[in-house]
Amino acid sequence: MKTFVLHIFIFALVAFASASRDSARKIGSQYDNYATCLAEHSLTEDDIFSIGEVSSGQHKTNHEDTELHKNGCVMQCLLEKDGLMSGADYDEEKMREDYIKETGAQPGDQRIEALNACMQETKDMEDKCDKSLLLVACVLAAEAVLADSNEGA
């Protein structure tokens, strides 16, 4: 029984460490063009918000509008280089396909519904940088809420 409890404890510790590491990671840093987009916008990794900061909404209260805009421009650059955006326009179908591939979501998955809602919420925004950051923030916040509700289930 002690071994079983120890295994549960270790599993919980690893899961917590993994979640903490993910929330500390910078938004967009998993993409191939991350360094290129940072350079194109004369930014360093220190200028980019963390996943945890964005998913919790803290980025909106802890940073100036110019920082928000610059982070959005990096996100737009990444989306455009991956063929998911052209200027301020989404390729919604490609965005869904890439999201499904990246997350392993299946048809009917609430994460896909959240992505669709986030694209709908931001689709009429004209500023491509602000639009991109709002989309990313919306999706990350929805994923955090869904993860919390699944943990409680």
Swiss-Prot record:
Mutation effect (E151K): In allele b1 and allele b2; causes a decreased net negative charge and observed lower mobility
Pfam families referenced in this protein's UniProt entry, alphabetically: PBP_GOBP
Phenotypic consequence of H63R: In strain: Pu-39
Stated consequence of mutating K123T: In strain: O-40 and Pi-21
Keyword Transport: yes
GO molecular function, one term: pheromone binding
Entry keyword Transferase: no
Consequence when changing E45D: In strain: O-40 and Pi-21
Disulfide bond annotation, renumbered to this chain: C37-C77, C73-C129, C118-C138
Keywords assigned: Behavior, Disulfide bond, Pheromone response, Pheromone-binding, Secreted, Signal, Transport
Result of changing M125V: In strain: SC-645
Function statement: Colony queen number, a major feature of social organization, is associated with worker genotype for Gp-9. Colonies are headed by either a single reproductive queen (monogyne form) or multiple queens (polygyne form). Differences in worker Gp-9 genotypes between social forms may cause differences in workers' abilities to recognize queens and regulate their numbers.
Protein name: Pheromone-binding protein Gp-9
Organism: Solenopsis invicta
Phylogenetic classification of the source organism: Eukaryota, Metazoa, Ecdysozoa, Arthropoda, Hexapoda
